[in-house]
């Protein structure tokens, strides 16, 4: 019996050796020569709605003993699924392509208008990709173009800078895959930051794309984008230049809080009060402006911004700010009634916006 077992084991080992047995094992790349992909872009393919064009970029890489920087490795493939595109790109590189370090996801506008749920759900199901990946929509263009525009320097560096600036209150809001899926599940809609390539190829912030039922409904830009940030309690990268009778000042928002109070007639939702409190700090001033007048000017400007954003969201019937949930927290006993009525009443709901600003002492 021992001789039979030994013979079987010997045969198995011989089968696995190169040149022995019916087939060889696949050639194993050197794991030291690994391409760590950092950014992924997804667009609709040229082959039609059933095709996806997937682009990945590694960022600048270090090679050799001196760690010389090499240009990013950019690969792309068009297939019917992301997983099949990944497999196809594996064969396009001499390095082992590893997707577990992808932390930036770019979505083309055409794909976003057709639907992004399948792409986001792939990140939630794949073992290598993560829910903490940052998501962006390329406004008026494709993800492949955005990645190629920054190919020399690497798009990863620019996206990481915007993300860091956002955390420091020096850029707009960012969203992760997990946050976006949660908003779509709980609120039926979500906002995602937009990007456009600048004249020198560097990616620039371009407002927010509002996604409803998994598809891009439209864009909030300019004053509407600033209003969205305020209503979301985000301290954005914005300087308000205010004029009063005695002079003016450039002020920055340092803190913001928002309460959302529903108004009922019986069990019928009739209105919503959105109250915003803001703390301001004067960065510079000219003349002799009165603090009270500066606060009043800021309140008027910010009320108009928030109202403009809300009117557009009502037009799309897209509650990407989670106003229903926030109002339900104030009236938990009426949450079921509020949730049932919300999709019907939100487009015509009267929302009263009030802003109270306070100027911090210099």
Residue ranges with predicted function:
Residues 2-362:
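Membrane-proximal alpha-helical signals and transmembrane carboxylates
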């Amino acid at each position: 019996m021992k001789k039979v077992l030994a013979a079987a084991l010997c045969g198995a080992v011989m089968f696995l050796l190169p040149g022995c047995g019916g087939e060889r094992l696949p050639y194993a790349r050197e794991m030291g020569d690994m391409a760590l992909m950092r950014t992924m872009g997804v667009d609709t393919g040229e082959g039609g709605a059933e095709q996806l064009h997937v682009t990945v970029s590694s960022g600048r890489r270090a090679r050799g003993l001196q760690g010389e920087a090499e240009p990013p490795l950019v690969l792309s493939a068009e297939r019917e699924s992301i997983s099949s595109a990944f497999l196809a790109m594996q064969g396009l590189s001499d390095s082992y392509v590893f997707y577990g370090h992808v932390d930036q996801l770019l979505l083309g506008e055409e794909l976003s208008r057709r639907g992004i749920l399948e792409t986001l759900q792939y990140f939630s199901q794949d073992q290598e990709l993560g829910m903490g990946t940052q998501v962006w929509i390329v406004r008026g263009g494709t993800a492949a173009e955005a990645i190629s525009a920054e190919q020399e320097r690497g798009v990863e560096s620019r996206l990481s800078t915007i993300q860091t600036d956002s955390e420091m209150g020096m850029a707009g809001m960012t969203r992760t895959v997990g946050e976006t899926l949660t908003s779509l599940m709980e609120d039926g809609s979500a906002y995602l930051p937009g990007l456009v390539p600048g004249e020198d190829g560097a990616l620039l912030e371009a407002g927010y794309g509002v996604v409803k039922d998994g598809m891009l409904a439209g864009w909030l830009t300019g004053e509407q984008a600033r209003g969205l940030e305020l209503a979301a309690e985000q301290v954005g990268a914005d300087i308000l230049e205010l004029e009063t009778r005695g002079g003016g000042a450039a002020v920055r928002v340092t803190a913001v809080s928002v309460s959302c109070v529903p108004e009922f007639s019986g069990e019928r939702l009739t209105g919503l009060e959105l109250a915003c409190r803001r703390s301001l700090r004067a960065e510079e001033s000219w003349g002799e402006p009165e603090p009270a007048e500066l606060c009043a000017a800021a309140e008027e400007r910010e009320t108009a911004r928030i109202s403009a954003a809300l009117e557009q969201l009502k037009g799309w019937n897209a509650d990407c700010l989670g106003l229903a949930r926030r109002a339900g927290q104030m009236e938990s006993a009426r949450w079921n009634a509020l949730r049932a009525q919300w999709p019907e009443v939100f487009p015509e709901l009267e929302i009263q916006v009030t802003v109270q600003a306070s100027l911090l002492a210099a």
